[in-house]
UniProtKB/Swiss-Prot annotation:
This is Bifunctional protein GlmU. Mg(2+) binds at residues 107, 229. It comes from Bartonella bacilliformis (strain ATCC 35685 / KC583 / Herrer 020/F12,63). The gene is glmU. It is found in: Cytoplasm. It is an enzyme of class 2 (transferase). Residues 253-449 are annotated as: N-acetyltransferase. Binds 1 Mg(2+) ion per subunit. The lineage of its organism: Bacteria, Pseudomonadati, Pseudomonadota, Alphaproteobacteria, Hyphomicrobiales. One of its GO terms (molecular function) is UDP-N-acetylglucosamine diphosphorylase activity. Signal peptide: none annotated. Pathway: Nucleotide-sugar biosynthesis; UDP-N-acetyl-alpha-D-glucosamine biosynthesis; N-acetyl-alpha-D-glucosamine 1-phosphate from alpha-D-glucosamine 6-phosphate (route II): step 2/2; Nucleotide-sugar biosynthesis; UDP-N-acetyl-alpha-D-glucosamine biosynthesis; UDP-N-acetyl-alpha-D-glucosamine from N-acetyl-alpha-D-glucosamine 1-phosphate: step 1/1; Bacterial outer membrane biogenesis; LPS lipid A biosynthesis. Its EC number is 2.7.7.23, 2.3.1.157.
Length: 449
């Protein structure tokens, strides 16, 4: 029997320690907001119902979440009265009949769907409350999971823990799952009789224990529950994410010569057999096919690189770039909104924008397309087997026919028929010995000043 699941993502925290006008959960690692990382893993874990509780920065968070997933129900926590109060802000969703309720914090971007699947499996096996825990060599600062006779009976925060309880190394990971049958009744029993006068989600455990419900602890890796509270922790989490991504790629058959110097985005796709040299940046939307070589100091975003292509060093591929098989893009080239056919070469010092290039075409050093007139972008179409000489300027809109040859230094403003040779430059004029007279004239003028 397939169990349905409601996941509640708590994203209402103010995040004051970030010291940023941007809501905490909208800060990014690998190019994706923290809360979207969490939602992605929740969906991969098979949870089809999603409630996101927002507070500070509600409008901005709502916009980002709804653009990322169409499944999200948004609920606002109007007062900051604790984590249980935040969960109950989604009361309308909780009132629906669901088997599993999964509660996750929106600032834990390193959670893996495999951990969430394991947590849900305990509910399927009969647990009523499941708490994610981890063992810490130094548990200072973390809530402790306190057991009695092998059973979890309560979660004690560090500030409230006795000396004996502080010796416990099993810590609260923050993620909790509830049997839908008991969820609302447990949450409704939580009170705010504490120093902070807040409603704590962790009190669910002691309430469930008193009711003799089945409470289980699932041990998950510490990095899965790392929360982000400041920009340094954001950096550390990003570094961990990058290390995971590089490891997964290398185990799949991608060669990365210096993985710590390469930056990947959340959706980077690289096939086995690709070679990546040091200091490469992959922005969102990049796909690299097998056999391609990405040389050092290249910057790619929104680009598809075909089989056996060679990129860089020092190349920039921008959004809308599609390179087919065995294309070469060399040093100090920028490609944007361009489709380049197989075996074509753009080897050095070129800007190619809003362009279609056919197969086996060569773009010489320093050749550029002029695609913008100050108001609108215009397209250049270059057919198969074309040679564009060095330092040529192609002024769009423009079409260059198959097999044509553009002489170096030309400025091309009109369409070129197939198999044409085009000169678009002024004729060279030679005046012998004129340089001697010119130098004498210039030298005299300089002395007179």
């Amino acid at each position: 029997m397939v169990r349905n699941c409601l996941s509640i993502v708590l994203a209402a925290g103010e995040g004051t320690r970030m010291k940023s006008p941007l809501p905490k959960v909208l800060h990014k690692i690998a190019g994706l907001p923290l809360v979207c990382h969490v939602i992605k893993q929740i969906e991969l874990a098979g949870s089809l119902q999603l409630a996101v509780v927002v507070g500070s920065g509600a409008e901005d968070i709502t916009k980002v979440v709804q653009s990322f997933t169409k499944n999200a129900m948004i609920f606002e926590q109007k007062e900051r009265l604790g984590t249980a109060h935040a969960v109950l802000s989604a009361r309308l969703a909780l009132q629906e009949e669901v088997d599993d309720i999964l509660i996750v914090f929106g600032d834990t971007p390193l959670i893996e769907h495999s951990s969430l699947v394991r947590i849900r499996a305990f509910l399927a096996d009969g647990a009523d409350v499941v708490v994610a825990g981890f063992y810490a060599s130094d548990p200072t600062g973390y809530g402790r999971l306190i057991k009695k006779n092998g059973k979890l009976i309560t979660i004690v925060e560090e500030k409230d823990a006795s000396d004996e309880e502080k010796k416990v190394s099993l810590c609260n990971g923050g993620i909790m799952a509830l049997n839908g049958k008991y969820a609302l009744s447990l949450l409704n029993k939580i009170d705010n009789n504490n120093m902070q006068q807040e409603y704590y989600l962790t009190d669910v455990v002691s309430i469930a224990s008193r009711q003799n419900l089945n409470i289980q602890v699932v041990e998950i890796p510490f990095d899965n529950v790392i929360g982000i509270n400041n920009c340094f922790e954001l950096f550390e989490a990003d570094a961990l994410w990058q290390k995971r991504k590089a490891r997964d790629l290398m185990l799949s058959g991608v060669t990365i010569l210096k993985p710590e110097s390469v930056y990947f985005s959340y959706d980077t796709e690289i096939e086995p057999g690709v070679l990546i040299e040091p200091n490469v940046y992959f922005g969102p939307g990049v796909k690299i096919q097998s056999g391609a070589v990405i040389r050092a100091f290249s910057y790619l975003e929104g680009a598809v690189v075909g089989r056996d292509a060679q990129i860089g060093p020092y190349a920039r591929l921008r959004f809308g770039t599609e390179l087919e098989r065995s294309v070469k893009v060399g040093n100090f080239c920028e490609i944007k909104q361009a489709k380049v056919g197989e075996f074509s070469k753009i080897n050095h010092l070129s800007y190619i924008g809003d362009t279609e290039i056919g197969t086996n075409t060569n773009i010489g050093a320093g050749a550029i397309t002029c695609n913008y007139d100050g108001f609108n972008k215009h397209k250049t179409v270059i057919d198969d087997d074309v040679f564009i000489g060095s330092n040529s300027v192609l002024v769009a809109p423009l079409s260059i026919g198959k097999g044509s040859y553009i002489a170096s230094g030309s400025v091309i403003t009109e369409d070129v028929p197939i198999n044409s040779m085009v000169f678009g430059r002024a004729r060279q004029v030679i005046k012998e010995d004129r340089a001697i007279k010119l130098r004498a004239h210039l030298s005299k003028n300089k002395r007179n000043k």
